């Protein structure tokens, strides 16, 4: 009887490990097939960020912003990224330009780095690999890099002239999104 229980336990454990490994490999292969991380790296390291790189970032984000978000979460910062990319795209599309201001380029670089960092953290986390089992894990503390990303982008936007419509744009997006305006 003990041998049967031990055998069943070993088989169950083997099945769980196999499923976990298959799931992890599946996620990894999707990343390598699409090459989106590589495209984001290329965009972030480009000498000059143009509308093309803005569209690469926007494409890597969700289709629509999340409706209700909590400050300093990834959903929150990705909403800011979405609104900012859409703003930049419209601004330069209307004027048929592709060259962004230096500050705009740096904000896009910061956003791309944040997206890459979040993806790395997500894939590196053992807990994230168990999401297919519907085991929900809420971190008690949000990753610090999200707050740092917001602070860097906000600081860069404040280097524009006070009369520029983009001065404090990151903060304005946040206030509007969070209902403070």
PLM segments and residue spans:
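Amphipathic, membrane-active segments
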Residues: 26-67
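A sequence-composition feature that detects small, non-aromatic residues
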Residues: 10-11, 15, 43-46, 60, ...
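Membrane-embedded hydrophobic alpha-helical segments
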Residues: 1-28
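An amphipathic alpha-helical interaction surface
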Residues: 65-181
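Amphipathic, non-membrane alpha-helical segments in soluble helical-bundle scaffolds
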Residues: 2, 6, 30-37, 74
């Amino acid at each position: 009887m003990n041998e049967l229980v031990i055998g069943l336990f070993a088989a169950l454990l083997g099945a769980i490990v196999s499923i976990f490994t298959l799931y992890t490999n599946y996620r990894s292969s999707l990343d390598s097939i699409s090459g989106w991380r590589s495209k984001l790296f290329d965009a972030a390291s480009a000498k000059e960020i143009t509308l093309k790189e803005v569209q690469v970032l926007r494409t890597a984000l969700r289709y629509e912003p999340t409706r209700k978000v909590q400050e300093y979460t990834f959903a929150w910062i990705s909403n800011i990224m979405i609104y900012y990319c859409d703003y930049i795209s419209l601004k330069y599309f209307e004027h048929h330009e592709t060259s962004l201001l230096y500050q705009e380029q740096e904000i896009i670089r910061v956003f791309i780095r944040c997206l890459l960092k979040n993806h790395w953290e997500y894939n590196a986390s053992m807990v994230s690999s168990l999401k297919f089992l519907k085991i929900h894990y809420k971190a008690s503390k949000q990753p610090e890099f999200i707050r740092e990303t917001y602070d860097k982008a906000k600081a860069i936007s404040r280097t524009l002239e006070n009369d520029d419509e983009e001065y404090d744009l990151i903060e304005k997006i946040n206030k509007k999104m969070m209902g403070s305006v």
